[in-house]
Amino acid sequence: MGSLSIWHWIVVIAVVLLLFGRGKISDLMGDVAQGIKAFKKGMQDDDKAPEKTEPVKSIDHGATPSATRTDVGSKAV
């Protein structure tokens, strides 16, 4: 009672083919294959090292005077 016989599988496959048709199933499998190829290509692109990086440029701030903070509108107590 727990296992499916060959006739159960034939009926299930027939229903699936009637619902989706041959064209839709092949289109679906083609889309899955394209997705897998795109995923593999993306994984290979991540493995490649960057070709050339430019050195980081730093900005020299020098001796700039620091601003003093004044509270506007506050009353001294």
From Swiss-Prot:
<feature type="region of interest" description="Disordered">
    <location>
        <begin position="43"/>
        <end position="77"/>
    </location>
</feature>
<comment type="function">
    <text>Part of the twin-arginine translocation (Tat) system that transports large folded proteins containing a characteristic twin-arginine motif in their signal peptide across membranes. TatA could form the protein-conducting channel of the Tat system.</text>
</comment>
<dbReference type="GO" id="GO:0043953">
    <property type="term" value="P:protein transport by the Tat complex"/>
</dbReference>
<keyword id="KW-0813">Transport</keyword>
<keyword id="KW-0997">Cell inner membrane</keyword>
<keyword id="KW-0472">Membrane</keyword>
<keyword id="KW-1003">Cell membrane</keyword>
<dbReference type="GO" id="GO:0033281">
    <property type="term" value="C:TAT protein transport complex"/>
</dbReference>
<protein>
    <recommendedName>
        <fullName>Sec-independent protein translocase protein TatA</fullName>
    </recommendedName>
</protein>
<dbReference type="Pfam" id="PF02416">
    <property type="entry name" value="TatA_B_E"/>
</dbReference>
<keyword id="KW-0811">Translocation</keyword>
<feature type="transmembrane region" description="Helical">
    <location>
        <begin position="1"/>
        <end position="21"/>
    </location>
</feature>
<keyword id="KW-0812">Transmembrane</keyword>
<feature type="compositionally biased region" description="Basic and acidic residues">
    <location>
        <begin position="43"/>
        <end position="60"/>
    </location>
</feature>
<keyword id="KW-1133">Transmembrane helix</keyword>
<keyword id="KW-0653">Protein transport</keyword>
<dbReference type="GO" id="GO:0008320">
    <property type="term" value="F:protein transmembrane transporter activity"/>
</dbReference>
<comment type="similarity">
    <text>Belongs to the TatA/E family.</text>
</comment>
<comment type="subunit">
    <text>The Tat system comprises two distinct complexes: a TatABC complex, containing multiple copies of TatA, TatB and TatC subunits, and a separate TatA complex, containing only TatA subunits. Substrates initially bind to the TatABC complex, which probably triggers association of the separate TatA complex to form the active translocon.</text>
</comment>
<dbReference type="InterPro" id="IPR006312">
    <property type="entry name" value="TatA/E"/>
</dbReference>
<dbReference type="InterPro" id="IPR003369">
    <property type="entry name" value="TatA/B/E"/>
</dbReference>
